[in-house]
Structure formats: C-alpha cells, structure tokens
C-alpha cells in the first residue's frame, strides 16, 4: 500500500521524504523493524519509542510517524511524518492497512466496570441463536467461528484490533462484538471505529491510580466516550452514574433495568437451583412481554441478560432466538458450574478481590445452601490489602473456607496464606477454615468433604489455565481437574 493511502483520514505534516513509498506493514515495536515497514513512535508511560527511531531506520524501516521532533540527521532516507497523536494515527492507519473491516460488519461495543464479559457472551449467544456469525473480543480472549486465542488486554492495541476484525471478516463474520475498556478509549485503541450499538452495564470506582485514571470523574468520562461513537446506546437506567456518563452523548438511547422508566424492564426474579443449574427466571415488560430463564445466578445476571435482550430487540431479532440464546449461555470462569455430583454444587469464578468476592458470596448465599464453602488464595507479589480483604469477607460470609495458593509467583505460599489468615481472624475470630497450600490438594479436599446441599465456590482463577510458581507457568485447568478426580473416585 502506498504511504499516502495508508494516511487517509490522518492529519499530518510531511517533515521529510516522499508519500509515494510502498509500505508493507505497520509496527510500533522497534524489535520488529524490517525493510518496507512504517514505525509509529509512541510516547509510553515507561519509555519513549522516539528514542528507537534511528535504530529502526538503520534496520531498514522505510517511514516514521512521530509525535515530537527528532534529529533528522539520524534517520536519512526515511519518510518522516509528524502528527498530534501517534496512537490516534496508529489506529487510523491500521484500519486503512486492513481495509477498514469494521465498516463492513455490525459493530457492538460493551463498556462498564462490571458485567462486560458476561454481557458480551450473552449477546454473542443471542446473536448466534438468530443465525448471526459473530466474532468476539474481550477479557476471556478472541472467539470466532470455533476459534479461540488469548489476548493481553481487554481491548487490544489498535493494530491487533484491526487485524482481528480483518480475520473476522475473512472468516465470514457479519458481526463484531467487543468489550471496550476505558483504557482502550483513552489510549485511542478504538479510534476510527463507529459502533452500531454501544452498551453500558454498570459503573463503580476502579482503575483509579498511577498509569490508569487520575479520578473517578475522568474514568467515567472516558467510559462515556463510547456513546459519542455509536448509533444506538443500550444503557442501564438504574445505575446512579448513567446520567453523568451520558453527558454529551450523540446516540439514540434505549434503556433497560428494573425500574418503571426502563424501556425493557425486569419484574421480580425467581432463583433456580439444581446440582447442575444455578440461575434466575424473570418476566420482561415495557416494550416487550416475555419470560426469560438464565443459567447464571443473582441480580447482576438479570441486568446482564436485560442488556443482551435489549441489543437483540434493537437488531430486530426474534424472541425465540433471544430466549434460546440467554437460556444456553455459559461464560467460562464466571459462575461456571462443574456438575460432578448430584449431592452438591461446585462452581468456578474469577472473583479475585474483596469487592467481587463479596458480590459473588452475597449472590450465592441467596440460594440458601446447606453450607457455603469457598476455596481461594491470593496472588503473590501483589497488594497485601487484597489478602486481608478477601480473608475478612470470606470469614464473615462463608460457612467454611479452604485457604490455598493462587499464582504465588515469587512469594512463598505460606506467607500469602498467613496474610489471608490475618484477614480471616479480623472478619470472624470463630471462622472455620483449613489451610492446604497445594491448590490441587485443596480441590480434592473440597470434593472429599462436601456435604449434601453444599454450594462450593472455587474462586480466583476462573478462566485461567495455568498455575504460576516462581515465575514458571504450568497447565492448571480447574474444570478438567475436578472432572478427572470425580471420575477417579467414582463420584455420583
């Protein structure tokens, strides 16, 4: 592709060289420098890649995009283009390089502090029940037409994002569905993308601190940017931050919630539980009239399902597809049941801090189990406050806890458990718990000592497939390990 074509839509100044160059690829990692490539110099939080421009040119890079002045004598022969924001330019050029695939698919973006992952999976399930071919990007990875691959970020860098959209399109997808993080919006990873539907789930203080957002107001403002980049906004009208988040929105709004003012509203919900089902059932009224059954527990599942249902209605999908899609949706590592016994219920969840743990245990307690049992640990080389907090919450809310490892990294598991124990003692000096450092042994213990009617939550890892000890990651798939052990001991 000619450099001039690659720059379509980008505001730039040609500082040096020609626009008639042929560009084979775009890079923003100097280690990938090679002839025929364009290097985008980005100012990061840790380093400024403008410092690597000269070496990239020496390694054959044909053109440079810069955000501030560089010494032109160090980059002879290369085209140099100056832009106001390198990240923004990278996003637009990446779209051009891959033929702007997002313009040829239905685009759906989901944002919020909690609920993004589950809601995107629910939307995907509804769309597929209606016959749509869907590509999905989010916390759990990239999914399309039977393929799955991991991602480093909830919202990948713009180049990877556009490349993935191209893969979706080439594979025959007609819809791209993605989680849109505040970082993805702030860092221009989704610049140049217009969404047909933007979805807002929920907002609470998170991602506030160095390298993220300075204040909650800034965090909320960036979330709200999605609703200046979409045609229709599907929003949770019950959230206290909705009005402020939508300030300056340019899209049509369709609302969901439990309040009377919602376009699609849920009535009183009923909790449903068997050994292999933990969910809710509720009636939807307002602009529709239908019963919904969801294979996920708690009030938050009602809201997530309402969001998916509303997206389906905006797209004109039949009620049968919406009902079927919501009923069969399962999200890996999010209240994921492992049906290995009729005697008790065991599930996996990614809850890994005190807020998500308290939310999960509150939800599970509502199902009135014989005992609420929690298997958990905390990550090594991470905040000790999380250990105290999770210990305190579990001591207060669980009937029995099994303290174990969770990616120790370079810390001793005994030290981590000691910190958790301090939180347990603070939360409830009479809390019942046992310490089993090896997580596999802890899983076996939970199964061996399960009582009739117990609800066992194995939390912290969720969708993760590894165990990290001393920086070495080895396979650790909790669902498979539980199923293998149940078969080994002949569990019924």
Label each residue range with its predicted role:
Residues 1-14, 35-38, 250, 287, ...:
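ATP-dependent carboxylate-amine ligase
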Residues 1-92, 228, 269, 293, ...:
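N-terminal leader/targeting and accessory segments in enzymes
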Residues 7-9, 70-77, 171, 196-346, ...:
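Acidic, Mg2+-coordinating active-site environments of NTP-dependent enzymes
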Residues 7-10, 89-233, 237, 241-249, ...:
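Phosphate-binding loop of NTP-binding sites
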Residues 44-46, 182-183, 204-207, 239-240, ...:
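Short glycine-rich anion-binding loops that position phosphate/pyrophosphate groups of nucleotides
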Residues 53-58, 169, 191, 365:
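Non-catalytic positions within long, well-ordered alpha-helices that form the structural scaffold/packing
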Residues 58, 62-68, 233-237, 375-376, ...:
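Short internal beta-strands
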Residues 136, 178, 198, 235, ...:
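Structural beta-sheet core signal
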């Amino acid at each position: 592709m000619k450099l001039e074509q690659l720059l379509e839509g980008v505001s730039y100044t040609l500082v040096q060289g020609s626009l008639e160059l042929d560009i084979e690829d775009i890079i923003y990692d100097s280690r990938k420098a090679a002839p025929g490539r364009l290097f985008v110099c980005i100012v990061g939080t840790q380093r400024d890649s403008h410092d690597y421009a000269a070496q990239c040119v020496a390694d054959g890079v044909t053109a440079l995009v810069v955000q501030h002045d560089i010494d032109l004598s160090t980059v002879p022969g290369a085209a140099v283009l100056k832009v106001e924001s390198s990240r923004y330019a990278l996003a637009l050029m990446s779209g051009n390089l891959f033929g702007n695939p997002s313009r040829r698919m239905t685009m759906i973006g989901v944002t919020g502090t909690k609920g993004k992952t589950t809601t995107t999976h629910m939307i995907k399930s509804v769309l597929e029940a209606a016959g749509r071919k869907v590509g999905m990007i989010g916390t759990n990875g990239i999914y399309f037409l039977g393929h799955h691959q991991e991602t480093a970020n909830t919202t990948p860098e713009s180049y990877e994002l556009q490349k993935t959209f191209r893969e979706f399109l080439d594979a025959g997808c007609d819809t791209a569905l993605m989680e849109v993080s505040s970082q993805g919006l702030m860092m221009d990873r989704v610049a140049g993308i217009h969404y047909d539907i933007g979805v807002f789930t929920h907002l609470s203080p998170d991602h506030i601190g160095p390298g993220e957002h300075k204040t909650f107001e800034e965090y909320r403002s960036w979330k709200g940017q999605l609703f200046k980049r979409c045609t229709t906004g599907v929003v949770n009208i019950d959230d206290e931050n909705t009005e402020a988040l939508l300030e300056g929105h340019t899209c049509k709004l369709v609302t969901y919630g439990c309040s009377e003012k919602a376009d699609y509203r849920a009535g009183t919900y009923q909790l449903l539980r068997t050994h292999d089902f933990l969910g809710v059932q509720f009636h939807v009224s307002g602009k529709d009239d239908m019963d919904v059954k969801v294979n996920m527990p708690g009030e938050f599942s009602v809201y997530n399902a309402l969001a998916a249902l509303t997206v389906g209605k905006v797209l004109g999908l039949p009620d049968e597809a919406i009902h079927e899609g919501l009923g069969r949706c399962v999200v890996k590592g999010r209240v994921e049941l492992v049906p290995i016994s009729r005697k008790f219920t065991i599930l996996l969840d990614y809850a890994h801090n005190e807020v998500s743990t308290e939310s999960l245990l509150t939800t599970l307690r509502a199902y009135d189990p014989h005992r609420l049992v929690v298997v958990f640990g905390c990550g090594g080389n991470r905040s000790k406050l999380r250990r105290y907090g999770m210990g305190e919450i579990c001591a207060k809310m669980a009937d029995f806890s099994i303290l174990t490892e969770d990616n120790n990294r370079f810390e001793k598991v005994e030290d981590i458990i000691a910190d958790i124990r301090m939180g347990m003692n603070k939360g409830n000096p009479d809390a019942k718990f046992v310490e089993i450092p090896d997580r596999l042994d802890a899983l076996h213990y939970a199964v061996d000592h399960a009582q009739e009617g117990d609800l066992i939550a194995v939390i912290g890892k969720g969708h993760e497939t590894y165990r990290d000890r001393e920086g070495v990651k080895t396979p650790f798939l909790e669902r498979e390990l539980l199923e293998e052990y149940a078969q080994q001991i002949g569990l019924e």
